[in-house]
Amino acid sequence: MADLAKIEEQLSSLTLMQAAELVKILEEKWGVSAAAPVAVAAAGAAAPAAEAVAEKTEFEVVLTAAGDKKVEVIKVVKDITGLGLIEAKKLVDEAPKPIKSNVKKADADEIKGKLEAAGAKVELK
């Protein structure tokens, strides 16, 4: 184990140029290429990221701005959230604020449509 620690210490002290030269020497000696595993790893890492985007099923509806028709937006927020008039007004006044969280895509789109029809600016996150 002590030998491995010494090797690790020596490798850590190499400059970038020395490390690149060492890679070339080892590739020639062992008959391998360091480029192929890197490309495979990069392709493998991209696939889970694409799956994560496709798997998003719950959204957060965020009111970013009330717009010119603030009274209409307050009414819609009141209806959507079930809050009282004062609480709905406070929520609209403090935009950007989440209106609904953990909602399905179809429901989030419906809520967004209602708020935008009332004049609000809305984002889905």
Swiss-Prot record:
One Pfam family per UniProt: Ribosomal_L12
Any GO MF annotation of the entry: structural constituent of ribosome
InterPro entries: Ribosomal_bL12, Ribosomal_bL12_C, Ribosomal_bL12_C/ClpS-like, Ribosomal_bL12_oligo, Ribosomal_bL12_oligo_N_sf
GO (cellular component) term, any one: ribonucleoprotein complex
Presence of keyword Transport: no
UniProt keyword annotations, A-Z: Ribonucleoprotein, Ribosomal protein
GO biological process: translation
Transmembrane annotation, as ranges: none
Role, per record: Forms part of the ribosomal stalk which helps the ribosome interact with GTP-bound translation factors. Is thus essential for accurate translation.
Subunit structure: Homodimer. Part of the ribosomal stalk of the 50S ribosomal subunit. Forms a multimeric L10(L12)X complex, where L10 forms an elongated spine to which 2 to 4 L12 dimers bind in a sequential fashion. Binds GTP-bound translation factors.
Family of this protein: Belongs to the bacterial ribosomal protein bL12 family.
Protein name: Large ribosomal subunit protein bL12
The species this protein was found in: Rickettsia africae (strain ESF-5)
